[in-house]
Structure formats: structure tokens, C-alpha cells
């Protein structure tokens, strides 16, 4: 496909999805209020008035309305191919996940039921559409090895369910989940363009447009929440797109999708650690997420969201740079160093803002003791 055609098609698809989403969102808002799909404030939430949710319905409809004609009649994706399977899995699984989220927005479904349905959808994707991780690389080597179903299947299911829920966990401030998802999708689009993956470029462009149209009404002060219908749908599509882009996993390449979705995944990881440390159920909600900690430090609602946007953009840039250097001979070693540095910075940041515990700061305490010892050793005797 000529570059000019791809760019023009991607821009047109983006604009169409944005327009449809922007037009549908006010209508969805009225529908949510009419049927009682609302979010009632409580001590854990930052909003103080009843807010309509179900906003993800506008994102879903905008995405499907553009991507269906685009890939069936314009791009003419072939059924039965790898791209065709991805397309079918994305639409089928995405529809089921969006329906699950919409029902939860209205009826507040039990967490266990939602998890079981997500697991079933992930299994449908893996076994019904043959979308799975297939190869792995020996660490610091170059030989690709097939992983077999015993590893590829559970790893794929874990990835889909994990990322689907990770986006939902950060949906705590106006525009946060939508904006972070948009940044992650933009990263996928850039990397797909660099790799020459036209299908991924177009899919990402459509979804970015759908998210952007909704974000007009969701950024602070929000007039509607995306709800689980949006958070779960965006999480599922991000999992699918990143999984397709990096199906052949190496020590280098598997870091890339982790970086692309770095903010929700790291926040989810620290949430699990925090609840284990504090001896609370893993699925129990709390006010210890990244956005809560930043607000407790004195940042306003809008500034907190923009700071997290910046962190998400940083992860995105790291993903692109890491992907580019991985093609060189030193890529594995550079990636290993990058992983260590990012993990160290994440731990320092988590301890500084109390993301895990208010008083337990092992790395900061170690650095303080080390500084004291070095200072004492440098004094003249």
C-alpha cells in the first residue's frame, strides 16, 4: 500500500471515528441518566455528584462503525488469515467485553462474575481464533524457540485478562483512563508504522479517534464517565493490539508491550503489592492508586491527570526507542539496562509518594544509610 494512501486513510478513519464518538457521547449520557447507569459518590471516589457512566458505549460504537466498513470493503482483509483472525477476535471479544461492561455500569455485577466472563472471552480468543503467543527467545541469545500450547496459551490468557483489568483500575479521575489509553494507542500506531504493519496502523488510528471524541466530554470537569463499558473494552483492545504486534516474544520484544501499557500495569502491580503488605484482599478497592497519591501530595485534579499523561508518554517513548535499538547487536544488553533503570525509578517513585506503604521505604532507607556511611568515611579523622 502506498504511504500516501495509508496516511490519508488513517487520517480519514481517525476523523470519522472522532466525529461519531463526539456525536454519540451526549446521547449516551442521556441514556445513562434515563436507565440509571450512574456512579454514586462515596468516600473512596473524588467526584461529589451523581455522574452518568456507560460512556464506553460511544467509543465502542464509533470504533465498530468505522473499522467494519474500512476492513471489509476498503482494505478488504482476508478471512482465515492471521490478520483476519485478529480482526474477528477483536470484534467478537470486544463486543462481549463491552456488553459485560455495559451491564456492570447499570447493575454493578459481582467482581467474580466479571472475572469469569473475561476469562471465558480470553479463552474464546485463544482457542476460537487461534490468537496466541507462539515463540520465545533464549535470554541473551538469538535462537527462536516455539513455546508450545502449555506456555503460549496460559501466557496469552493472562496477558489479555491482566491488561483488560489494568485499564479499569486506573479509571479514577476525569479523562485519566481515556487519555492514557490514547497515548498507549498512539505508541502502538507509531511502532506499527515503523514496522510497516498497515492493519495495526489503521486499527489504532480508528480507536484513537473514538477515544478522542469521547475525551471531549470526559476531561475535567467530566460530564460523563466511560464506566466499565469503556475501561474494559479499551483494556481488551490494547491487549489484543499489543499482543498481535509482538506475538514472537523475546526478552527484548516482550518488554515493549509492557512499556506501551506501563502506567496501568505498574499501578496494578503496586496495588497488588500494597494490598498484600497491608493484608487486604487483592480485589478490595482502596485510595492508594497513583492518582490518589498525587492528589494527596497537593496536586489538583487536572494537574494529576496531566502528570500521569506525561508518565505514560515517557513509557511510550521508551517503548519506541527500545524497539529501535533492539534491532542492533547490543539491543538485548541495552534493554536489560533499561529494565533495571526503569524498575529502580519506579520503586523510588512508589516509595516517595507512598504508593505501597506510608512508612516502609526499603530502597530510600538503604540509600539514606549508604549516604551517611559515605559521609562518615569522607570526614577527616
Where are these regions (language model features)?
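Hydrophobic transmembrane alpha-helical segments of multi-pass transport and channel proteins
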Residues: 261-269, 317, 344-348
Amino acid at each position: 500500500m502506498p504511504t500516501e494512501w495509508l496516511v490519508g486513510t488513517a487520517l480519514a478513519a481517525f476523523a470519522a471515528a472522532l466525529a461519531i464518538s463526539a456525536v454519540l457521547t451526549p446521547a449516551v449520557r442521556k441514556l445513562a441518566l434515563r436507565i440509571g447507569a450512574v456512579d454514586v459518590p462515596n468516600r473512596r471516589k473524588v467526584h461529589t455528584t451523581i455522574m452518568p457512566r456507560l460512556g464506553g458505549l460511544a467509543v465502542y460504537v464509533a470504533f465498530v462503525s468505522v473499522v467494519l466498513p474500512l476492513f471489509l470493503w476498503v482494505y478488504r482483509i482476508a478471512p482465515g488469515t492471521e490478520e483476519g483472525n485478529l480482526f474477528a477476535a477483536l470484534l467478537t471479544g470486544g463486543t462481549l467485553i463491552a456488553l459485560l461492561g455495559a451491564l456492570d455500569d447499570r447493575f454493578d455485577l459481582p467482581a467474580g462474575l466479571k472475572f469469569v466472563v473475561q476469562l471465558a472471552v480470553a479463552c474464546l480468543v485463544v482457542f476460537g481464533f487461534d490468537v496466541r503467543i507462539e515463540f520465545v527467545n533464549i535470554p541473551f541469545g538469538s535462537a527462536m524457540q516455539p513455546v508450545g500450547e502449555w506456555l503460549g496459551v496460559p501466557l496469552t490468557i493472562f496477558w489479555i485478562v491482566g491488561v483488560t483489568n489494568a485499564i479499569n483500575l486506573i479509571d479514577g479521575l476525569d479523562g485519566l483512563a481515556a487519555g492514557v489509553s490514547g497515548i498507549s494507542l498512539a505508541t502502538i500506531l507509531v511502532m506499527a508504522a515503523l514496522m510497516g504493519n498497515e492493519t495495526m496502523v489503521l486499527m489504532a488510528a480508528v480507536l484513537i479517534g473514538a477515544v478522542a471524541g469521547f475525551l471531549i466530554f470526559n476531561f475535567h470537569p467530566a460530564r460523563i464517565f466511560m464506566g466499565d463499558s469503556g475501561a474494559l473494552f479499551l483494556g481488551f483492545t490494547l491487549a489484543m493490539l499489543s499482543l498481535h504486534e509482538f506475538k514472537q516474544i523475546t526478552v527484548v520484544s516482550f518488554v515493549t508491550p509492557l512499556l506501551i501499557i506501563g502506567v496501568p500495569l505498574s499501578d496494578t502491580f503496586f496495588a497488588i503489592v500494597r494490598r498484600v503488605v497491608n493484608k487486604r484482599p487483592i480485589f478490595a478497592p482502596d485510595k492508594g492508586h497513583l492518582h490518589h497519591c498525587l492528589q494527596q501530595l497537593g496536586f489538583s485534579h487536572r494537574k494529576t491527570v496531566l502528570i500521569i499523561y506525561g508518565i505514560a508518554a515517557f513509557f511510550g517513548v521508551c517503548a519506541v526507542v527500545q524497539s529501535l535499538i533492539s534491532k542492533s547487536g547490543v539491543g538485548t544488553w541495552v534493554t536489560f539496562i533499561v529494565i533495571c533503570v526503569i524498575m529502580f525509578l519506579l520503586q523510588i517513585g512508589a516509595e516517595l509518594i507512598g504508593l505501597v506503604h506510608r512508612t516502609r521505604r526499603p530502597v530510600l532507607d538503604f540509600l539514606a544509610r549508604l549516604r551517611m556511611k559515605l559521609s562518615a568515611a569522607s570526614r577527616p579523622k
